[in-house]
């Protein structure tokens, strides 16, 4: 996914939020999935220049953000990395009714350090993950609660590789922490979203998980 498209859509979301709410006109508090850090930071700066309205963004895994909102953390807008944690927020009646919609989609990709010898990995049922990792760990958000990890577990399970890969995971609290392990070459491979990969100069995409191995990677948002 092109970084500019992410920024454009994030900007459109903020504009719609301003138009549909009566909260304080000098500040918008956004709780956003860590995968949107770069795009939302850029659009927030431009938005303030254009409107004199400050966008205060808090980034973490969607599970962490949803639970913070449940505990009373103030937010005007919640942007989740998957539908599951938006479902959670809605079920807990933390969101304004009828404000949920899918902001954009994403890809699930395999990354390696920029200077790694690995250039292309065909991800299928024949992929030899142990050989690819060569004694190292596969960095990914914790599949127990982090959306990117949940998608990764689903994809690897459908490829018949989960039992092999599970003990080899380096589990992190959010997608950006997983990518950071690959950037620092502490892990030879990682699973992130396409939007994260293009935001880093230190990693490269070496494979894309087939779309039919996991649920669509969708980024929903809603007003709190």
Question: What does each model-found stretch correspond to?
Answer:
Residues 9-14, 18:
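Hydrophobic helical h-region of N-terminal Sec-dependent signal peptides
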Residues 24-50, 54-73, 82-83, 87-106, ...:
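Exported/periplasmic ABC-transporter solute-binding proteins
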Residues 1-9:
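Bacterial N-terminal signal peptides that target proteins for export
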Residues 79:
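Short active-site segment of divalent metal-dependent hydrolases/proteases
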Residues 18-24:
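Sec/Tat signal peptide C-region and signal peptidase I cleavage site
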């Amino acid at each position: 996914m092109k970084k500019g498209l992410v920024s454009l859509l994030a900007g459109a979301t903020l504009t719609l939020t301003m138009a549909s709410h009566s909260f304080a006109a000098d500040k918008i508090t956004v709780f956003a999935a860590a995968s949107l850090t770069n795009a939302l930071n850029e659009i927030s700066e431009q938005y303030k220049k254009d409107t004199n309205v400050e966008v205060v963004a808090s980034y973490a895994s969607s599970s962490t953000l949803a639970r913070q909102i449940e505990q009373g953390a103030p937010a005007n807008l919640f942007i989740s990395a998957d539908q599951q944690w938006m479902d959670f927020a809605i079920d807990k009646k933390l969101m304004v009714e009828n404000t949920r919609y899918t902001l954009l989609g994403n890809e699930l990709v395999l990354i390696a350090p920029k200077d790694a010898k690995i250039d292309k990995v065909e991800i299928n049922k024949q992929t030899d993950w142990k050989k690819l990792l060569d004694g190292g760990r596969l960095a990914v958000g914790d599949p127990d609660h982090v959306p990117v990890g949940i998608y990764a577990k689903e994809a690897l399970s459908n490829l018949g590789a989960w039992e092999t890969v599970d003990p080899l995971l380096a589990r992190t609290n959010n997608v950006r922490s997983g990518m950071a392990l690959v950037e620092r070459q502490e892990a030879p491979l990682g699973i992130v979203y396409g939007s994260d990969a293009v935001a880093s100069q230190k990693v490269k995409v070496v494979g894309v998980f087939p779309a039919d191995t996991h649920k669509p990677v969708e980024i929903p948002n809603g007003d709190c």
